[in-house]
């Protein structure tokens, strides 16, 4: 029945433990996280708020899925290997992959859950691809975010040197 589904925009989804988790997290944070990626995209692009970067792991192949409001294709391979065509990317840019499915409509609560979907505690998140892609906790590949941090810093090394006093 309809009580087993919920709607975001024009899309309907099944209520499961993931839905219950997101609902409770929203309640516990006074609904401040109940926004969509598109709601802070402009502020991030203008550097009014920090850039949020979320990671998940694609269960089928172990690739990292990078979620952000800004283009992240530069994060798909280590910086030193970006020009090496013999090495395939080991990550996927969520917004680029789902460009036809309104990726900026993703709720921040869902991005947080995708980043922290620990097996058996929460169900994997199933994404609208063919074949279906399911993702889980990013900790499988990069529990502390070191890989993502180093890739990001490597890509912006020159900019950081020219425009900041450094990175702690």
Predicted regions and their residues:
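Catalytic domains of lipid- and phosphate-ester/thioester hydrolases
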Residues: 1-168
